[in-house]
């Protein structure tokens, strides 16, 4: 089966700074992948390339069989900062198909409610792929857990392909089929860790020794990396 998203030797430079170095990654149709790594490892850069907001300096990305040359309706994007139009009501923010929300402005909503609205708006457009850049990062711990469960419930019904960036290792393991660990300076793929835990995910799974073992493996991978220099990378070291 062909992957839904393919990063093929993707390189991204900002002037003399190498942000992404030869990223190769396939994400299967219907897969839920989380991406973790230290600050500056290129997680958001990779997602912006996947959405078409950035064009890579080298290599390319395919969605299905089509090269990504810009944003497209088959890709929905959800950001940490909610990305709602403050001058529109909640109803208007999700007007692509959801009509049973209250006629309130986003400023009247809590953080969790704003993010529910943003996710609902993305889902209402019926994208094949959801690109999520730390969508729960600004939420309190309890709301964050509830949002994780709601997202997994929606994903389990429709199995859209999800690429989800997070700094939270527990969140990465709880949500994903696979955890993509990136390394920094330059940003590159470090390793891929499978999450062999059943769905639906529950509180019992969070507390299980199997979950702890995977979490510890991801934690060790993220926090025990040595950044390379551009010169080392260019020599393949």
From Swiss-Prot:
Report which residue ranges the record marks as coiled coil: none
Task: Name the SMART domains for this protein.
Answer: AAA
Annotated GO molecular function terms are: ATP binding; ATP hydrolysis activity
The UniProt record lists the ABC transporter domain at: 5-205
Binding residues for ATP = 37-44
Q: Could you tell me the keywords of this UniProt record?
A: ATP-binding, Cell inner membrane, Cell membrane, Membrane, Nucleotide-binding, Translocase, Transport
Asked whether the keyword Manganese is assigned, the reply is no
Where mainly located?
A: membrane
Function according to Swiss-Prot or TrEMBL: Probably part of an ABC transporter complex. Probably Responsible for energy coupling to the transport system.
Q: What is this protein called?
A: Putative ATP-binding protein BMEII0108
Species of provenance: Brucella melitensis biotype 1 (strain ATCC 23456 / CCUG 17765 / NCTC 10094 / 16M)
């Amino acid at each position: 089966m062909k992957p839904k998203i393919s990063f093929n030797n993707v390189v991204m430079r900002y002037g003399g700074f190498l942000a992404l170095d030869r990223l190769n990654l396939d994400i299967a149709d219907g897969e839920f992948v989380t991406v973790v790594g230290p600050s500056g490892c290129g997680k958001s850069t990779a997602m912006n390339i996947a959405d078409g907001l950035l064009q890579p300096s080298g290599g390319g990305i395919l969605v299905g069989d089509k090269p990504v040359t810009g944003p497209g309706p088959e890709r929905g994007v959800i950001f940490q900062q909610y990305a709602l139009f403050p001058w529109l009501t909640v109803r208007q923010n999700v007007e692509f198909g959801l009509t049973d929300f209250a006629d309130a402005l986003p400023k009247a909503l809590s953080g969790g409610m704003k993010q529910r609205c943003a996710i609902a708006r993305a889902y209402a457009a019926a994208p094949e792929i959801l690109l999520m850049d730390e969508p729960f990062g600004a939420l309190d711990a309890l709301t964050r857990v509830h949002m994780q469960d709601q997202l997994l419930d929606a994903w389990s019904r429709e199995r859209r392909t999800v690429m989800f960036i997070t700094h939270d290792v527990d969140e990465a393991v709880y949500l994903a089929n696979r955890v993509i660990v990136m390394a920094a300076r330059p940003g590159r793929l470090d390793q891929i860790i499978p999450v062999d835990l059943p769905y639906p995910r529950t509180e019992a799974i969070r507390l299980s020794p199997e979950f702890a073992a995977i979490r510890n493996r991801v934690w060790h991978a993220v926090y025990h990396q040595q950044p390379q220099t551009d010169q080392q990378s260019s020599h393949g070291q």
